[in-house]
Amino acid sequence: MNKKVVIGMSGGVDSSVAAYLLKEQGYDVIGVTMKLTPDDAFYTEQEGGCCSLSAVEDARRVAYRIGIPFYVVNFTDIFKEKVIDYFTEEYLNGKTPNPCIACNKYIKFDALLKKAESLGADYIATGHYCRIVEENGRYVIRKSEDEKKDQTYVMYNMTQDQLKHTLMPCGDYKKDRIREIAREIGLNVFDKKDSEEICFIPDNDHGGFIKRECPKAVKTGNFVDKEGKVLGKHKGIIYYTIGQRKGLGIATGKRVFVTNIDAMKNQVVIGEEEEIFENELISFKNNFIPFDKLTEPMEVDAKIRYNAKASKATIYPVDDENVKVKFEKPQRAITKGQSVVFYDGDLLVGGGIIK
């Protein structure tokens, strides 16, 4: 009997081709699109967003074309709680979160997996560019064949059980080849552009989104220097992030950057560029994939944000909750709330959230 797999389909080229590849490999494939955002005009009218009508229809058409059943599953409540509310609260606390990491942890590889298991499926699948491999009796994640498109950074929270029941067929291909396959089999999405914005904020206006969600929580405050001297007024801490230079709306006669955000005092600290370079950080909510726990110092390559270049570092266990990361060279704009992710060559070691 064929193994059954439920694949999350966004209407994009990657998940569409992933569904086709799995069917070709002999799996019984069921396509699902996850409804994540509320029934609200702001979300439903945003063309191209993850839950737009066009995305659902693209996924439905692909499923019909490749001959697999298709359903829409509703995860709006848990997505609101675990992703949208988390994103909003972190910004209001002066941090800069990565909602894709929260979505993967709680929605794609938890809620969707549980839903798939309830349908009697053996696996879930996605169109992510990662390779899941079993080595020495343990599941690990390695970078994809296409390093430019590699998405392992957002996968560091995965557990052994999740990895055991997850397939990511695109990880063995270059993106160009995925598009070629889509064209060869007659999928209209073969040239659909990649989505780069946060799925629930298609206009990319983070501040505007948070103000809409929590209008009373966004308050003006002071720009200050590191000594606390007031330099001007800011429009609300949600509009700023560490390392930001543009859009500050303050004239100081020199180039200045956001060096810290103090949510308790509702202050944005600004200073010289050299003040945004640091060579160590502490991470918490850490997860490791090749082993359960970090017990001794380890040399790694570490990334402090999705698009950052990995830099040489040593990670040290501090206690059950925290890991210290010491970089060989100072890093620009280490940002609270972002994730730091560790690699050993192409092996994803793990990661955590920057304190």
Swiss-Prot record:
Residues annotated as transmembrane: none
GO cellular component, one term: cytoplasm
Recorded GO MF terms: ATP binding; tRNA binding; tRNA-uridine 2-sulfurtransferase activity
Enzyme class, broadest EC rank: transferase
Top-level taxonomic group: Bacteria
GO biological process: tRNA wobble position uridine thiolation
Entry's EC annotation: 2.8.1.13
Cysteines joined through disulfide linkages: 103-199
Keyword GTP-binding: no
Catalytic residues of the enzyme: 103, 199
Site annotation Interaction with tRNA: residues: 128, 338
CDD domains: MnmA_TRMU-like
Keyword line: ATP-binding, Cytoplasm, Disulfide bond, Nucleotide-binding, RNA-binding, Transferase, tRNA processing, tRNA-binding
Segments of this protein annotated with the region Interaction with tRNA: 149-151, 305-306
Catalytic reaction(s) noted: S-sulfanyl-L-cysteinyl-[protein] + uridine(34) in tRNA + AH2 + ATP = 2-thiouridine(34) in tRNA + L-cysteinyl-[protein] + A + AMP + diphosphate + H(+)
Annotated function: Catalyzes the 2-thiolation of uridine at the wobble position (U34) of tRNA, leading to the formation of s(2)U34.
Family label: Belongs to the MnmA/TRMU family.
The protein, known as: tRNA-specific 2-thiouridylase MnmA
